[in-house]
Amino acid sequence: MIPFSGLLFFYLLFLGLLPAVVLGLLGKKLHYYGIFLCAAMLVIVFWQNGQLAALALFFLWEMALCCLFRRLPKRTRPLLWAAVVLALGPLGLIKLGEVLQPFSLFRLMGASYMSFRAVQVLLDIYDGRLQKLRPVALGYFLLFFPAVSSGPIDRYRRFLSDLDHPPDREHYRTLLAQGIWKLAGGCVSAVVISGFIQQYWLAALPESGFGATLSYMYGYTFYLFFNFAGYSSMAIGTGYLLGIQMPENFNQPFLSVDMKDFWSRWHISLSTWLRDYLYSRFVMKSLKQKRFSNPRTASYLGYVLNMMAMGAWHGLQPQYLLYGVYHSALMCLNEVLDLHCKPFRSFKTHGAGQVVCVLVTFHLFSFGLLIFSGRLI
């Protein structure tokens, strides 16, 4: 069973959310029932997939790392990176196993999202932004079932704020209406539209030929957008019904005027996570230590590190790594043009130039997804 896919899941979700809606409309706290519902849904989904034991071990591992790191009397940088490596260790084994099939040790749906949540907690503890951990709230955050398989990647402090300030009856009515709308819209997007594209566009194309490949590029781009945005919308909508307001993951990405603008609109929770916890940390540390004679070098290398991490986050297969290389080059080129080409800055924000830049950005990203799909390899 896959979350937000299949009649059985939606039937169970409907039954599970009904008590939450009643509690919310009565102005009662939702997080205790939310924890119960998350545990029940995770047991059902992962038991059916044969991954329940792997999920339990993974969860205990990440919880132990976060709690033990918080208890350390002195948290040094080497200890931080050791904790981060250990937190990402299971994910690395899973990704390596996908390359070395059939020698995979284990598989776990949603490991990428759960790992990044745990790493974020470790980094926030080290930076002093988390003074204490509440184990039950941390466990709820790590295993919040609507976001387990497709995100968004929430932030612990924001999640905790929702738990500490539950919606009153009036606010919950608004969340209920928005949540139902997001669930319905996401279902149409992920199930109906993307399913139609897959069956009647992509599946009908021959496997070779320039025209077929070009058509596949466009079809795959729209398929992935409607599929991924739809799943994100359903996850966010379900969260609303449980009183958790997860961040938006898409904001009209195909209206972007350049690639930097695009990555502020597509898979927003992942791109901002990488920006805040990888790119910014690398650049600020490099500038502070004066690692490079040209300060811009730190920014360029930060983009390379950022986009390569994004590629590897999807998998270690060649197409994902090439996808990271491709977007590294695009982001660096974007930075150079922004810094040294005044006509470009003006061109992309006015009239016909803006339209041209939107079309170019769309095609640059679509070609990147063609690489990502593995069709060119």
Regions flagged by a language model, labelled:
Residues 1-377:
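Membrane-embedded transmembrane alpha-helical bundles that form the catalytic cores
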